[in-house]
Amino acid sequence: MLERAPVVTVDGPSGAGKGTISQLLAEKLGYKLLDSGAIYRVLALAAIHHNVELDNEESLTLLAAHLDVQFITGNESKGIKVVLEGEDVSTTIRSQECSNAASKVAAFPRVREALLRRQRAFAEAPGLIADGRDMGTVVFPATPAKLFLTASAEERAQRRYNQLQDNGFDVKIDQLLSEIKERDDRDMNRSVAPLVPAEDALVIDTTNISIEDVLAMALTHIHKSFQVPA
């Protein structure tokens, strides 16, 4: 079944440039944006706000089904703004408390199913840019416009290192590289929704390509898929 509105999926590992490209595509095309990586953190924060116990699968499932969240493009350097029930929670959801809570709520099958339906509901006119890890393989498999961004582990570690350094964190690049390689191995070899490109996805290795060139390649692919102005 085709989606209700044009959907562009942007999958790939952390540090490949998904967030930046997704934001630029949303701005260029006037499409809405879905940051699926933040969904579980947002749900966890909503549960905390509404005093929902993190082991109450029924209440969490109901909350997930009606999750009032928006993802808004803005200043590229600041990234995507995450708005929960009218409140900017972009910083709050990155807290350790939200991270721990997100791991708990994600363990419930009914919660995951409710969030899957909630993510699909983002597909509304004029269109959607869906940023994630399994958008093209699980959430929106019917869309013809699928992108998969990747980059070498070394390049992604360097990007993450620069980002953390810019934000005042003292980190070691060797440790970041090790963590990235371990996560890649887990993600690519897990039994449920492994991190792999959809068969019909355009795979772009961003290691030695400028953001401008990646954006141009992505827009050309979208134009061919949907015949929308590139």
UniProtKB/Swiss-Prot annotation:
For this UniProt entry, what is the primary localization, expressed as one broad class?
A: cytoplasm
Q: Where would you find this protein in the cell?
A: Cytoplasm
Name the EC number(s).
2.7.4.25
Q: Which CDD domains does the protein's record reference?
A: CMPK
**An individual GO BP term:** pyrimidine nucleotide metabolic process
Q: What is any one of the record's Gene Ontology cellular component terms?
A: cytosol
Q: Which reaction does it catalyse?
A: CMP + ATP = CDP + ADP; dCMP + ATP = dCDP + ADP
Summarize where ATP binds, as residue positions. Answer: 12-20
Example GO molecular function term?
dCMP kinase activity
* UniProt keyword list: ATP-binding, Cytoplasm, Kinase, Nucleotide-binding, Transferase
* A UniProt-annotated Pfam family: Cytidylate_kin
Give the family per the record. Belongs to the cytidylate kinase family. Type 1 subfamily.
NCBIfam families in the record: cmk
Alphabetical list of HAMAP family matching this protein: Cytidyl_kinase_type1
UniProt name for this protein: Cytidylate kinase
**Gene designation:** cmk
